[in-house]
């Protein structure tokens, strides 16, 4: 495999992992809430909805239902860069879903 195809394959796996973490943390946050989240997952975007709130991820951006946007990136080391801050993928997914479901 060429370096480009390895990077593309790694990014696909990171994208799937990000969606899975969002789903898991949304379910966990839903245990202590009167609402639940719905995750829409595709190759180009992931949307998490909880009640009237939503957050949408593309490969380069996070957009919220309130109109806010922020840069977003999945890094090869398994971290996430969101709004200029780098964090472990699981911590970022927990924070995103917790904020969405409050």
Tell what function each PLM region has:
Residues 9-12, 19, 48-51, 66, ...:
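Generic detection of intrinsically disordered/low-complexity segments and helix-coil linkers/edges
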Residues 1, 86-89, 101:
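Detector for methionine-enriched segments
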Residues 1-37:
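Contiguous, amphipathic alpha-helical segments that mediate oligomerization or scaffolding
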Residues 92-102:
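Extended, compositionally biased alpha-helical segments that mediate assembly or anchoring
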Residues 24, 29-66:
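Amphipathic, interaction-prone secondary-structure segments
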Residues 52-91:
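Intrinsically disordered, low-complexity regulatory segments enriched in Ser/Thr/Pro
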